[in-house]
Amino acid sequence: MKENSNPENPESQEKNLSETPIPKITIICSAPDLASQNIKTQLLNLIEWKLLEIPENSEFSAARESQDGKFRLVDIEETHVFQDGLDRKLENAGLPASLIIFASKHRSKEEISSLTVHCTGNPSDDVRLGGCPKSLAVSSPAAMKSILVEMKRLAEQKGLKYDVTLEVTHHGPTELSVPSLYAEIGSTEVQWKDPEAGEVAAKAILAVSLVKVPVAVGFGGGHYAMRQTKLLFETGISFGHNFPKYKLEFVDEALIRQAIEKSKADFAYFDRKSMKSEERKKISKILENLGLSVLKESEIREKYGN
């Protein structure tokens, strides 16, 4: 945009303001990711999009905006997990984001058909899958809840035999200043290319809601956070960051403080039976020092039950 040569000219100022790109919910699709391309195809079929001009020197291969102005759809040539700083790159390309949704594949050894949602971060020093050590991305609990609930509703409506579940915090990117989440199809090439699953994921993304809900940070359980998932579906709450039992040894005050701040958490939840007594005591003490209460499942259901 050219600078306003006459700052006293209201008409010129109004023109500049109107040309300032507005942050949008931004869906990121990766070229080498089969599930991402499946979801992209469904998104393009479901609603009308217009192609956007992007700078030649940007790292994006294409960008579109929905006709209603709510979403942008941006193509990248790389994998999602190594996209630290993506928010700044989007802004520099004139595509600022208010929320980043990574449309992605999910891979598991069990090869379970699944639709999953999670936020990103590295509780330990392991950064093989992107991000920085002991760093968490800003989560979007309301968006995660709405997408997961809609995935479940649509999958049941279609009779799809897919597990719909919340995953714990894992992998990159971590260095993003705007909220983000992953919406995924798993867990093999068969599911990644399944158009029915792609349609469910795409429709759920387009139905995303940012209406505030009570938020917990979670501790314990396995990778698929089964008890947290049940609470998300069966009560009015959502979860921000979740740390599974096999990562609790790395959880310290600095990480918990990050999780609270980057989830805007109202309380904490323990999957108690999965946690060692010393882990519960350690984390309880940290939470007490930080002023965050721990609610039991029965208390959550009583206070926030649907």
From Swiss-Prot:
Transmembrane parts of this sequence: none
Catalysis performed (reactions): a D-aminoacyl-tRNA + H2O = a tRNA + a D-alpha-amino acid + H(+); glycyl-tRNA(Ala) + H2O = tRNA(Ala) + glycine + H(+)
A Pfam family matched in the record: tRNA_deacylase
Binding partners and assembly: Monomer.
InterPro entries from the UniProt entry: Deacylase_DtdA_archaea (IPR018033), DtdA (IPR007508)
Cofactor comment text: Binds 2 Zn(2+) ions per subunit.
One annotated GO biological process: D-amino acid catabolic process
Broad EC category: hydrolase
Enzyme Commission number(s) of this protein: 3.1.1.96
Stated family: Belongs to the DtdA deacylase family.
Amino-acid biosynthesis found in the keyword field: no
Cofactor(s) for this UniProt protein: Zn(2+)
Function: D-aminoacyl-tRNA deacylase with broad substrate specificity. By recycling D-aminoacyl-tRNA to D-amino acids and free tRNA molecules, this enzyme counteracts the toxicity associated with the formation of D-aminoacyl-tRNA entities in vivo.
Metal-binding in keyword set: yes
Lineage, top ranks: Archaea, Methanobacteriati, Methanobacteriota, Stenosarchaea group, Methanomicrobia
Protein's name in the database: D-aminoacyl-tRNA deacylase
Keyword line: Hydrolase, Metal-binding, Zinc
Gene Ontology molecular function: D-aminoacyl-tRNA deacylase activity; zinc ion binding
